[in-house]
Amino acid sequence: MVENAGGSELAAVLQALADPARLRVVEALSRSPQRAGDLAAAAGVPAPTMSKHLRVLLAAGIVTDERGARDARVRVFRLRRESVVAVRAWLDQVQARWDEQLRAFKAHVEREGRR
């Protein structure tokens, strides 16, 4: 999903996550797979709005869907672990660079303070 951390795939994932209702969907799916109607209730949005949110999350590769075993009309949505891992890896890289910059700044200030 996010092989190139600076690429358009990561941007699509972050853009998809930039909506509070979609964040609530991701939180709900992190607990268990769910149907669209249940997700709409959890996110506090009407069913048609949830359908739009789910299309965005599917297109970004954040969730997957499958047809219900007993009823093919029912779709069950699941969070893709890979999408969460990829975003976390990118954030960890950004944090590591930031931490390195802070260490370098601290060392600089300490050197200057000794003069």
Model-derived segments and spans:
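Beta-hairpin "wing" of winged helix-turn-helix
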Residues: 38, 59-74, 78
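Charge-dense, helix-prone N-terminal extensions
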Residues: 35, 46, 63, 107-110
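Amphipathic alpha-helical dimerization/coiled-coil segments
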Residues: 1-8, 27, 82-115
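N-terminal helix-turn-helix DNA-binding core of bacterial DNA-binding proteins
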Residues: 2, 8-49, 74-85
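Short, hydrophobic-biased segments on the C-terminal half of alpha helices
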Residues: 54-55
